[in-house]
Amino acid sequence: MSTLNKYKTLIIISSLAAVSSCSWFSAKDGTEDIDDRYMKSQQDLELQVPPNVKQIEVQDRYRVPEGVIITNRNAKGKALSLDPPQLLLVGGDGVREDSEQSHPTVWVRHQDTPFMNYVSRFMMQKNIPVISSTEKQISSDWISDEDEDIFSQYIGSYNLDGQRHKVTLEIIGQNANEVAVQARNTQSQRLVDDKWVTMNTSKTVASQFLNAFLGFYDTERTKEARERILEEGTINVSLGTNSQGQIALIAERDLIAIWEHLPSVLEDLNLSVSDRDQSAGIYYFNVKEPETGFWAWLWGNDETNAKVDMEPGDYQIHLAATTYGVSMTFKDEEGNLLDSNLVTKIYPEFAASFKSRGK
């Protein structure tokens, strides 16, 4: 054992012994810490209401005008659905629920490949029978819990035996960066006395079907991103300027590749991603306070400290396509450009991390 380790061990043992001895010398029955003054308190005068104050009168000031037809009332009593609640898989990056829709709907971030290609591949991979398909909609035939295919376990598992369902996936909205996907349980039947009897459709069945697709979509996108990174190889980063002439890091790669690569680079530099906005091309990250003091010196653990020389706080990285590739412009929490000297200082660490990530 080295001399330094012996000193560290001796300091730890001495500290523990000192704390134990202090607690033993000060030990009492604990009554000195009890404040029992409340037991001696006396009741004061009752609250006096001023003479000009009248009794509060509760009135319905928001009456519905006569002749108004009320629609879309929330279900009550027996009209409530007996289906168990089913949450949508919106925890992943780029997926958000559209709660204003009457059927389970999510907005999925998507820009390149036609989205319906993933829907068709999903139906094919899961061996789901298809009865109709268009550029924006695909509908299944009956999916039964008695099907041999494992996909039948994804829907109706909470229901009685002998049920079958038809489900439709449809693109109901689209913008530059997102696609709105909706799932509907169009038909449901139950087997009663060897006859199929129509039953109420279920939002839970639709949600489970949509969740199955979202899981497939996320897996496929992750696989494609990994293959793209392996094919593209090393990412070279240089110091340059963006399209506005501001100092920035320049990567000779397409925007999607850098966007997908940047989280692993920040993690490698011990910089935590706090948020992201792909539509605006912005990553938000945080530089934590370095661990200092006696215990940090004692254990000598610098693995969690930031590997770049930046002040603790919140920062932004703005990505934009340029003639030569992608520019990465660094800004502070308020959106102000970082000093060019600071960007020059942190450039080598970012360049080295990008290069190692691409191998």
UniProtKB/Swiss-Prot annotation:
Q: Where in the cell is it found?
A: Cell outer membrane
Q: Where is the signal peptide?
A: 1-21
Q: Which chain positions lie within coiled-coil regions?
A: none
Residues anchoring lipid (N-palmitoyl cysteine)? C22
Question: What are the entry keywords?
Answer: Cell outer membrane, Lipoprotein, Membrane, Palmitate, Signal
Bilayer topology term: Lipid-anchor
Q: Where is the lipid attached (S-diacylglycerol cysteine)?
A: C22
Mainly resides where? membrane
Is Membrane found in the keyword set?
A: yes
* One GO CC annotation: cell outer membrane
What's one GO BP annotation on this UniProt entry? Gram-negative-bacterium-type cell outer membrane assembly
Q: By its UniProt entry, which InterPro entries does this protein fall under?
A: BamC, BamC_C, NlpB/DapX
The record's section on Pfam families has: Lipoprotein_18
Known function: Part of the outer membrane protein assembly complex, which is involved in assembly and insertion of beta-barrel proteins into the outer membrane.
> Which HAMAP family does the entry link to?
OM_assembly_BamC
How does this polypeptide assemble, per the annotation?
A: Part of the Bam complex.
- Tell me which family the UniProt entry assigns to this protein: Belongs to the BamC family.
What is the protein name stated in its UniProt record?
Outer membrane protein assembly factor BamC
Upper lineage is:
Bacteria, Pseudomonadati, Pseudomonadota, Gammaproteobacteria, Kangiellales
